[in-house]
Amino acid sequence: MRFVDEVVIKLQAGKGGNGCVSFRREKYVPRGGPDGGDGGNGGSIYLKADENVNTLIDYRYKREYYAENGRPGEGRNCYGKAGEDLYLVVPVGTSVFNIDTNKKIGEVLQHGQTFKLVSGGKRGIGNTHFKSSTNQAPRKFTLGEEGEYKEVRLELNLLADVALLGLPNAGKSTLIRSVSEATPKVADYPFTTMYPHLGVVKVGVDSFVMADIPGVIEGAAEGAGLGLRFLKHLTRARCVLHVVDICPFNESDPVENYFAVEKELEKYSQELFDKPRFLVINKIDLLADKVEQKCQEFVEQIGYQGNYYTISAAMKKGTDELAKKLNEFLQKQQ
C-alpha cells in the first residue's frame, strides 16, 4: 500500500431540518392548536483515530465529504430525524490544519479518540413554540441553519518512541528488521526506503516503537531527496538514533557523512535537533581489524560526547544490547 501522509479535503456538515407549520385537525377538535414539530439537527463530521490504519491513502482519491441533512419537522409535534454524523477514520497521530489560516486546529493521538471537524446546522423550530395568549394559531416557524463548511489539511506524524536517522544505505532498514518484526525493503542502493516504516521492539515484558524514515542527504532541508518530507515524522519521537555507516561502499568519509546529516537536521528544526540523540556505528563487520580502535577514533574525530553503540545490523551483533539500552532510557523518561 502506498504511504500517504498529507491530504487536503473539503467538508460540508449537514443542514438543519426546517420547523413545521401544522395545526391539530381531528373530527371533534375543529379548532385544534398548532402542532408543528421541530426539524432535526444536521449531521457533523468527525475525525476518528484507528490504530489499525497506517496511511491517509483513502483521502487522496476522495476529497469532498458531506454529512447528512436533518429532516424537516412534521405535524402532531413529530420531530424530524437528525442527520447522521460522519466519521473519517485516520491513523493515530493525525493532525488537522485550517487551510485558510494554516493553523493547527486539532489532532487525534489515541486509538478511538475523536475530534469534531465541522458542526451540523441547528434544527428549525415548529409553530408549536410560537403559540401565545394573543396568538392561538401562529404560522411562524424557523428554517434549519446551514451546516459548517471547512477546507482542511490532514497531516500524519508517526507516533514512535525511537526514530532512525542517517544517510541512505546507512543500514537503518536492516537495523529495524533485526530488532523488530518490521519488514522494510533492504538493498544496496540509495533510497531503498521510500516511505516510513514502524516496528515494535520487544524487550522482555516491555516494548517500544521504532520508526525508519527515508535517508537524509545534503540539501534535504531545502527539499533535496526524500528526507525533508519525512523528517516531520521525527518530531514526536522521544529520542533519535543517528545511524552511521562506518565502512561506506562508495568509500565516502564517515566523518563527513555524520556532519552532513547533523547539519541538515539542525537546519530543518532546532527543536528536533535538541531531542535526545544517540550515535549508532553500524556495519562493524566490514572492518578488517581493530574494530574498537577505529570506532573510538571516529567518535573522537566528530567530537561526540554522548552514548554511542557499535553494531552490525546485518549480523545482529550488538543489536540486542542496543535495544535493551534504548528500553532503559525510555523507561526512565516515563
Curated annotation (Swiss-Prot):
Record-given protein name: GTPase Obg
Cofactors named for this entry: Mg(2+)
Source organism per UniProt: Francisella tularensis subsp. tularensis (strain WY96-3418)
Class of enzymatic activity (EC top level): hydrolase
Similarity comment: Belongs to the TRAFAC class OBG-HflX-like GTPase superfamily. OBG GTPase family.
A GO cellular component entry from the record: cytoplasm
Principal location: cytoplasm
Disulfide bond entries: none
Stored PANTHER family: DEVELOPMENTALLY REGULATED GTP-BINDING PROTEIN-RELATED, MITOCHONDRIAL RIBOSOME-ASSOCIATED GTPASE 2
Entry's Gene Ontology molecular function annotations: GTP binding; GTPase activity; magnesium ion binding
EC numbers, comma separated: 3.6.5.-
Domain called Obg: residue spans: 1-159
Pfam families: GTP1_OBG, MMR_HSR1
Function: An essential GTPase which binds GTP, GDP and possibly (p)ppGpp with moderate affinity, with high nucleotide exchange rates and a fairly low GTP hydrolysis rate. Plays a role in control of the cell cycle, stress response, ribosome biogenesis and in those bacteria that undergo differentiation, in morphogenesis control.
Subunit structure: Monomer.
Cellular compartment(s): Cytoplasm
Residues binding Mg(2+): 173, 193
OBG-type G domain ranges (all copies): 160-331
Binding site for GTP: 166-173, 191-195, 212-215, 282-285, 312-314
GO annotation, biological process: ribosome biogenesis
Keywords noted in UniProt: Cytoplasm, GTP-binding, Hydrolase, Magnesium, Metal-binding, Nucleotide-binding
HAMAP family the UniProt entry points to: GTPase_Obg (MF_01454)
